[in-house]
């Protein structure tokens, strides 16, 4: 029976070739489409994980309810011990504290008076720990336009859009005007170590990145963090595991 069908297909190529080509093309397109969608989805999830959520996130219940207001008075305390516990409970993930805050960036003139001012969305991330992978996660070596990665707690990276708005460049000094985790008024000086462009449109328009030690110093948050983010060791998001 099989031999009979094979002979029929060979003798009448018009009935065998075109259906075979149609099947091959269809299967190829389906495989390509699935691969493309999985890649695009993982890229989207990775972008979201970097900027806001991690693959998993630990916050206080109170902070979660008011997270859009960046309520650092509801932050996590004793984060070092929390991260130690999480690392033992979930060894497939690595954990990093983050301080998320907003305020105004003030640029003084030669007389110390305000020359330029703009709102800022700032993230205090762990640049300096021995096992930190933040530079890798943010791909800063790829997106850094000018300057260098922060080397001290007073160094800051700002987006090229924000640098243009404030008319500042690498080496300039800016003053953060904001509030501490106890809602007290605070000012803190940062030195612009570099500028970056994440190519994420409005998401990084007013963004500033500093080391978490500088953020804690500026906001009086010793040992505290707005949130603790967890990333899978492979940096690939797995919804079932999360």
Regions from the language model: what does each represent?
Residues 23, 54, 59-63:
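Short, conserved active-site loops that position catalytic residues or coordinate cofactors/metal ions
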Residues 28-58:
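Alpha-helical transmembrane segments
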Residues 61, 65-66, 71-209, 213-223:
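A structural signal for hydrophobic secondary-structure junctions
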